[in-house]
Curated annotation (Swiss-Prot):
Natural source organism: Acinetobacter baumannii (strain SDF)
Underlying gene: panB
Pfam families per record: Pantoate_transf (PF02548)
Family: Belongs to the PanB family.
Organism domain of life: Bacteria
Residues annotated as the enzyme's active site: 179 (proton acceptor)
GO molecular function terms noted in the UniProt entry: 3-methyl-2-oxobutanoate hydroxymethyltransferase activity; magnesium ion binding
Protein name per its UniProtKB record: 3-methyl-2-oxobutanoate hydroxymethyltransferase
Length: 269
């Protein structure tokens, strides 16, 4: 089973690691067979599974249910679970809700924010809960951002994001996840923290790992497709097409053919 120590080792060795969202046991088993390194039970299930307009209505109970299903289907990947909207607004809530999803099978929890999360990260870490902090475009704050848009477009904004990363890493964050930021910034942050694995989605190909929503990479997105998405399913055929798509994603992350330049945001900072 992949562990946090393995992710750190991968980074030290320069080996890129793969991450996909997953919400059920059958997909989890296919990801195990494809040797996907990390699985994120994301609150994206609100849209991908429940058909909602955003992640905001997702509950801790939802997250625990899907975490348990994924864990039963996959004994290989590191399992990371989102704490959903407003479920870590207080330290008491953060501890209780982290306990719930960890007992369901998560090995790490993910929360969205910046430097203001430092105390929460510190308390969770001291209580034995590894924490991934999601920065850049954070979907739980979509109404604050005014939509799903590229973040840290200027040097000033990029430096603020770096300061946020520094604060949460110093507080004990085990992993960083960057979403929708310039490729240059993704590289800067990955290089700035040699002992902290950095996962990217729309953050360039210099981050240590890459994550996609499974429905997106299987071509099950109806409507606008994000720039950072590649449809790995259309390259496959036959009864093993889904498994082959997962294998292709894993291989493309490792050899850095994904994300290609067309999947990234090239902004001079």
């Amino acid at each position: 089973m992949i562990s946090l120590s393995d992710l750190r080792k991968f980074k030290a060795e320069g080996r890129k690691f793969s991450c996909l969202t997953c919400y059920d046991a059958s997909m989890a088993k296919a990801m195990e067979l494809a040797e996907i390194d990390t699985i994120l039970i994301g609150d994206s299930l609100g849209m991908a599974i429940q058909g909602r307009d955003s992640t905001l209505p997702v509950t801790v109970e939802d997250m625990a249910y899907h975490t348990a299903a994924v864990r039963r289907g996959n004994q290989h990947a590191l399992i990371m679970t989102d704490l959903p909207f407003m479920s870590y607004a207080t330290l008491k809530d953060a501890l209780q809700n982290a306990k719930t999803v960890m007992q369901a099978g998560a090995q790490m929890i993910k929360i969205e924010g910046g430097a203001w999360l430092s105390e929460t990260v510190q308390v969770l870490t001291r209580n034995g809960v590894p924490v991934c902090v999601h920065l850049g475009l954070t979907p739980q704050s979509v109404h604050v951002f005014g939509g799903y848009k590229l973040q840290a477009r200027t040097r000033e904004a990029a430096d603020q994001l770096i300061a946020d990363c520094t604060a949460v890493v110093e507080a004990g964050a085990a992993v960083l996840l960057l979403e929708c930021v310039p490729a240059q910034l993704g590289q800067e942050i990955a290089e700035l923290f040699p002992n902290t694995p950095v996962i990217g989605i729309g953050a360039g190909n210099a981050t240590d790992g890459q994550v996609l929503v499974v429905q997106d990479m299987l071509g099950l997105t109806f409507g606008r497709v994000a720039r950072f998405v590649r449809n790995f399913m259309k390259e496959q055929s036959g009864e093993t097409a889904i498994l082959d798509a997962f294998k292709a994603f894993h291989a493309a992350v490792q050899d850095q053919s994904f994300p290609a330049k067309e999947h990234t945001f090239q902004v001079e900072l």
